[in-house]
Amino acid sequence: MSTASGRSSRTLASAPTDEVSARAGPTRAPSSPELMPYRLREGLHWCQCAGRIVFLDLLEDRYSCLSQDATEAFLRLGKGQSRPEDSERLRSLIARRMLIETPGAIPWDRPARIAPVSGDLVHEPYPKPSLPDLIQAVTGQLGWSLLVRTRQLATIVRRLERRARRRSPSTQAASRRIAQLTSAFAAVSAFLPAEDRCLVRALALHALCCRHGIRPSLVFGVRMNPFRAHCWAQLGGKVLIGDFEQVRLFTPIAAFG
């Protein structure tokens, strides 16, 4: 799966790997010998993948990537070990207000921490899906597809997390219920193909799981060379939807729910 959503003009994956370097951006940061304390703007998530810092910006619905020099400067800033030249290397992040000056030192936001995946929770052959589950798999994907096309990703994530909080976690018959739901999604993939729709499918399954008292995580991941993004749902270390053989190739950048 090469994209994180099925968007058209606002697709997350339409933003190519963006070299944020010292010469990007029109506004200069102050040329002080040391960087002031900074924090990451709200809605910004990051990870280190293949030696580079990659950002997922929920407010802008896009991914971006730092140059090697900016990556090193960013990591030093997070450790409170900035060098004089780092102000120039991070100038673009400051100009774009991805880094926001703060009055005093605060703990640096860490990248997503999610349990490493070890396999798919449900394996073929799937149980025969029921008609109600098939209907929910179709209507759920159609509904989330509309939201993905018309709403900001930050809004979608907030809605998902509100729904998850309203449900009481339950483990009774969880594996069996997940197998039934996963079977329904597999069955309808003949006319709602999985390719380039990983975000919609993961959102729809996540919502159905929460409706049945099961609390999975919605995870976004990235890989480099070439840049790819993926989205999946997982419970503990098991992938519910998104295919373990693909998921294991991606570095998690954000997790919700």
Which ranges hold each PLM region?
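Short aromatic-centered micro-motifs
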Residues: 57, 233
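Secondary-structure boundary elements
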Residues: 124-197, 201, 207-210, 234-235, ...
